[in-house]
Amino acid sequence: MLTMSKFKLPSDRLWPRASTLIKPNLKKADIALVGVPAHKSSISPTSAHLTPKAIRTALEKYSTYAGSKQIDLRGLNFTDLGDIANPDGQEGKKRVHKKLNGVLENYQTLVALGGDNSITFSVASALFPDLSKVGLVTLDAHHDLRDGNTNGSPVWRLIQAGLPGKNIVQIGISDFANSKEYSRSEERRVGKEC
């Protein structure tokens, strides 16, 4: 059986691959990628820690050009800051904060590749110590308003840390994917659900 990891894509100078844009550890760049392969706090078993590597591998299949918008990404500088080792739990949160402290001073945009969505809290709180001026858009079937430190709680933890609910937009919230008790409709006052 032939898998993508064993298959070598042909080289074509007229088809620049997205993966070739990313240079490791540039001191300054327009966009920086960082892997945050968290998975141990997931409510259900997961292999989410494999996602950063899978995304990087998938970039080998994509070009740099968005034809519908006529935008070529080759004009931007991309860098890869690598993966944050063992990002789970309180010690992992400290490692995330250490790695991301001041990162937006050198990189215009940071793309954090999870892991499970527990990284939302660690990454947002590392980048924005004052959450009162931050907005959050989630793409998820779940509200993520559970108690505790799991992949089901990052939005609630951010609200408790100072993120105003009115600054949150949740896209994809599904019926039968959340409990009435964890909807926390009065406490969270989420700005918009789509």
Please describe what each predicted stretch is.
Residues 2-192:
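Conserved alpha-helical scaffold segments that buttress catalytic/binding sites
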